[in-house]
């Protein structure tokens, strides 16, 4: 497939990851619905690539160690099993200066069953972090360098919790509890 550039690869079902990536000249935006990797070593190598967009479907289990390894601007995980303590560790890692390219993380928490919703506990999630609560009636526009699967580049954020890193970088945590959702927005210096 010489001369063809594929920017975003979305997979559905099984396919030969290594051959496909090589043939498509390693797209920078990838959506997986299932885990295509045969070993943790190959998965770890994949995580440390410089990607723009990475979205994991419900057939993909992402651990805290995985999240800490992923080098990407946008990370999306459907049916995440990561809970408050894991995310607290991740946030503290970012505050120490890791993941400079990160712009957005969106995790949809898995439910125990479809009737029982387990919302994120803000106190556990933000434990030990200095944050400012932003009122739910305050709406801000977040500009993404990479469009989502619908092609949108602008996200309206209502409320949240602002946290500032020592170097001045600001990020906002937004928790939605009707379908437990954790989002982290890292503001660029010109927003």
Predicted regions and their residues:
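Non-core capping and flanking segments associated with repeat-based/extracellular domains
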Residues: 1-191
């Amino acid at each position: 497939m010489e001369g063809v550039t594929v920017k975003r690869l979305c997979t559905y079902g099984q396919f030969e990851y290594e051959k496909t990536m090589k043939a498509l000249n390693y797209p920078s935006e990838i959506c997986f619905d299932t885990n295509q990797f045969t070993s943790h070593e190959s998965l770890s190598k994949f995580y440390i690539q410089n990607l723009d967009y990475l979205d994991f479907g419900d057939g993909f289990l992402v651990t805290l160690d995985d999240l800490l390894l992923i080098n990407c601007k946008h990370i999306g995980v459907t049916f995440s099993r990561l809970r408050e303590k894991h995310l607290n560790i991740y946030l503290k890692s970012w505050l120490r200066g890791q993941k400079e390219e990160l712009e957005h993380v969106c995790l949809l928490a898995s439910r125990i069953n479809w009737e029982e919703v387990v919302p994120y506990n803000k106190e556990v999630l933000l434990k030990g972090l200095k944050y400012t609560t932003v009122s739910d009636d305050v709406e801000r526009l977040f500009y993404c360098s990479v469009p989502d699967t619908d092609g949108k580049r602008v996200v309206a954020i209502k409320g949240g919790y602002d946290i500032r890193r020592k170097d001045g970088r600001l990020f906002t945590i937004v928790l939605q509890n009707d379908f437990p959702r954790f989002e982290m927005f890292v503001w660029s210096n010109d927003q």
